[in-house]
């Protein structure tokens, strides 16, 4: 075996869904083999967990409500560009939303919950509740949390292009036949 480092989370090729429980299931085997696995050591997840731990230790007696906000104010100068691996980003943004409240996971339709949030130095941006993997580890490791949500910003042009990609079937993750060849649309895109 070997040690393992993951900046995000495992996501199966055939399902637009991910969760830490799949990787946490390996903990005892890694420990027995004397191996280390570090999950979620990117920015979100990763730095977001460090910020939460720092706030819990230095600023609060307990954390009850946690909203993580991810605002990308960048401009690629293109009509449609993702800020992460395009396939993973499209899968992440088009799946159902999920957040934690009162000991339960609440599932929403994609982009169902949104509002304008003010970001210092950037201004107001429309922000959407999406599911992001660090919510799982944060509610597990900070049991006083009553509600945890992850918000991400998207411009209307981005969302319009995303809807077109979905409507023409290019966000699909199941194989289709194209000119006698089997392809999976989203990686082909």
Where are these regions (language model features)?
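A generic structural signal for alpha->beta connector loops
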Residues: 1, 34, 144-147
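C-terminal catalytic/substrate-binding lobe primarily of soluble NAD(P)-dependent oxidoreductases
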Residues: 58-189
């Amino acid at each position: 075996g070997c040690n393992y480092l993951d900046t995000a989370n495992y996501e199966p090729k055939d399902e637009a869904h991910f969760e830490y429980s799949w990787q946490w299931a390996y903990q005892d085997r890694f420990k027995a083999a004397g191996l280390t696995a570090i999950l979620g050591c990117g920015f979100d997840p990763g730095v977001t967990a460090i910020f939460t731990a720092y706030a819990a230790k230095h600023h609060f007696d307990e954390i009850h409500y946690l909203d993580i906000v991810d605002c990308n104010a960048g401009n690629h100068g293109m009509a449609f560009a993702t800020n992460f691996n395009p396939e993973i980003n499209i899968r992440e943004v088009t799946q159902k939303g999920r957040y934690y409240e009162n000991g339960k996971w609440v599932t929403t339709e994609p982009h169902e919950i949104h509002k304008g949030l003010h970001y210092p130095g950037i201004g107001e941006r429309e922000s959407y509740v999406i599911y992001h993997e660090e919510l799982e580890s944060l509610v597990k490791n900070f049991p006083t949390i009553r509600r945890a949500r992850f918000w991400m910003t998207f411009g209307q042009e981005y969302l319009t292009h995303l809807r077109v990609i979905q409507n023409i079937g290019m966000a699909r993750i199941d194989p289709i036949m194209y000119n006698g060849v089997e392809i999976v649309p989203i990686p082909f895109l």
